[in-house]
């Protein structure tokens, strides 16, 4: 398990605007772990880099800060899940599921290959169907009681090229998708830097060109593209793609890719 300084992690997770503020905040005892409330007061202390942090006394909007990714996507792509049956692929603790519910989803299939990760409050919600130890790449329409019209994808250590064919089988015609594109799991091994981090904007651009082209081949139009407001593991920049299942699929973001990558690198240039 890779480790990171507490102050650096707090900064990367957006708790502070600068590294110096993060350092002072940690020293003041303002930073705690979301999971167990453990308080950190030594900026240089190294903790697992997947430790989710929050400010002391802060009430998180969703069960996971990761929910902010889908929140941004719904806003920038002007999407609605009101009254919809949806799938959260790679649900984990359920940040995306929580966003969907708070935005009026009628039913959410929370799918994950792992077990015992979904937040307790979501497990107890009658609108949530928890599907643990479920490998979505083998999913079939019959696995779901209702046909979903919206899906989110946030998976790790697997390419979207293994997820989209299954989603095409399951999703309703004209169904909408928000997919988190993680270049570190899409690029060739030779393109990935130290500690699994990709810093080269050209690699990001190449990955987005390849992934969006692949999505079209799998029957999804690519209608929107932006960058995730939160960096992924080890500080990787990640991207949000808006897809739609259509008979005549097309890539409508090709001309935007370079500009989106530039904005992302500008946003995270000091991180």
Predicted stretch roles:
Residues 4, 20-79:
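S4-like RNA-binding module at protein N-termini
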Residues 81-92, 100:
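Conserved class I S-adenosyl-L-methionine
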Residues 94-95, 116:
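Glycine-rich SAM-binding Motif I of class I
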Residues 99-107:
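Conserved S-adenosyl-L-methionine
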Residues 108-162:
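S-adenosyl-L-methionine
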Residues 161-178:
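A short glycine-rich, Lys/Arg-flanked "PGG" loop and its adjoining helix->strand segment in the class I
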Residues 174-183, 187-188:
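Conserved beta-strand signature within the Rossmann-like core of class I S-adenosyl-L-methionine
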Residues 237-239, 243-271:
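Flexible, glycine-/basic-rich loop-and-beta segments that form/coincide
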């Amino acid at each position: 398990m890779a480790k990171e300084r507490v102050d650096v992690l707090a900064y990367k997770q957006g708790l502070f605007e600068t590294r110096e503020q993060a350092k002072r905040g940690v020293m003041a005892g303002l930073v705690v772990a979301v999971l167990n409330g453990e308080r950190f007061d030594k900026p240089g202390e190294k903790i697992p880099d997947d430790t989710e942090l929050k400010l002391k006394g802060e009430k998180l909007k969703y069960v996971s800060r990761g929910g902010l990714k889908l929140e941004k996507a719904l806003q920038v792509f002007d999407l609605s899940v009101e009254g919809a049956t949806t799938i959260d692929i790679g649900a984990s603790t359920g940040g995306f599921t929580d966003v969907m519910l708070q935005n009026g989803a009628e039913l959410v299939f929370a799918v994950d290959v792992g077990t015992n990760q979904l937040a307790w409050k979501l497990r107890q919600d009658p609108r949530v169907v928890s599907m643990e130890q479920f490998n979505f790449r083998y999913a079939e329409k019959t696995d779901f009681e209702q046909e979903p019209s919206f899906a989110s994808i946030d998976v790790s250590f697997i390419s979207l090229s293994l997820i989209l064919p299954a989603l095409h089988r399951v999703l309703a015609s004209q169904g909408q998708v928000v997919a988190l594109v993680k270049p570190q799991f899409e690029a060739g091994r030779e393109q990935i830097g130290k500690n699994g981090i990709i810093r080269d904007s050209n690699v990001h651009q190449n990955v987005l060109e390849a992934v969006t082209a692949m999505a079209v081949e799998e029957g999804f139009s690519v209608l929107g593209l932006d960058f995730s407001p939160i960096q992924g593991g080890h500080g990787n920049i990640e991207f949000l793609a808006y897809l739609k299942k259509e008979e005549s699929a097309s890539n409508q973001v090709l001309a935007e890719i370079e500009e989106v990558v530039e904005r992302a690198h500008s946003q995270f240039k000091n991180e």
